[in-house]
Amino acid sequence: MDIKKIKVLFLIPNLAHGGAEKVLVNLANNINKEKFDVTIQTLFDVGVNKKYVNSSVKYIGGCRFMFRGNTNIMKLFSPERLYSYLIKDKYDIIVSYLEGPTARIVSGCTNPNTKLVSWIHIEQHNEKVASGSFKNYNEALKCYSKFDKTICVSRTVKEDFQSIFDLKNPVEVLYNTNESNLIVKKAKDKIVDVTFDKDVYNLVSVAKIVPSKGYDRLMKIHKKLLDDGIKNHVYILGIGEEQEKYEKYLRDNHLEDTFTFLGFRDN
């Protein structure tokens, strides 16, 4: 006798080079497919992590390119309207895997038999930031209140979220999923195109090159250390919208030889 699988949808803006996107792919790939029918749907069909989605996971891509102002455009439509336009199938569980736009969309589900989950990955600190993808704070509170459960990736994220939104439904902590065996395996790979100078301090950072990561401050600290006679070399693993601006700063301050962008890498 065939057991009916639980249909789960994960909605996320895209599968770009961020940590949440990678973690979602890890999670979806490793969910028990004998019990769950898993789908990942993106608002934008872009991102380096698309290629890592297993064939056992259904993938639904959205718009083929990202464009500025998309969040503001979505605010013109109600959550219910967006949901009915974007989500075409019926699911037992729908997960908004990032705070913001996808949470607003998923909250528009009107099927009482569908369980809704909101997954929060970052500390948002205040009402203004937390409601940036909504029309206002009241709409954000109304939308998040419709979720049966909210998952936060750490205790501090949970505390931050609850300081902004006072929800009746459960808010729980669930740490990110990692493919530990794959990490151990890749740790044995030899990296041949990067050589560390043993006579200087080598600093490696892994993150998107976006304002929130603070790389502008890191470059200034790097320069000050060099000016103070402390030799060091910084390596950045990642890509992002701020890279060209940061590279200009490095050129203007003659730091190109001691601050290296390595780009996105599988390992």
What do the PLM-derived regions correspond to, one by one?
Residues K5-I6, F10-G18, K22-N26, N30-I73, ...:
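N-terminal strand-loop element at the rim of the active site
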Residues E247-R265:
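Nucleotide-activated donor-binding/catalytic signature segment of Leloir-type glycosyltransferases, i.e.
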Residues V8, I93, S107-E127:
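Active-site proximal beta-strand in glycosyltransferases
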Residues S96-T102, I120:
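Short His-centered aromatic/hydrophobic patch
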Residues M74-E80, K115, Q124-K146:
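Nucleotide-sugar donor phosphate/pyrophosphate-binding loop at the beta->alpha transition
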Residues G18-N26, Y201-K224, I230, E241-E247:
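A conserved mid-protein helix/loop that constitutes part of the nucleotide-sugar donor-binding site
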Residues R104-V106, S145-V173, N178-L182:
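A short, active-site helix/loop in glycosyltransferases that binds the activated sugar's phosphate group
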Residues Q124, T156-V157, L174-D189, K208, ...:
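Short beta-strand->alpha-helix junction loop in the catalytic core
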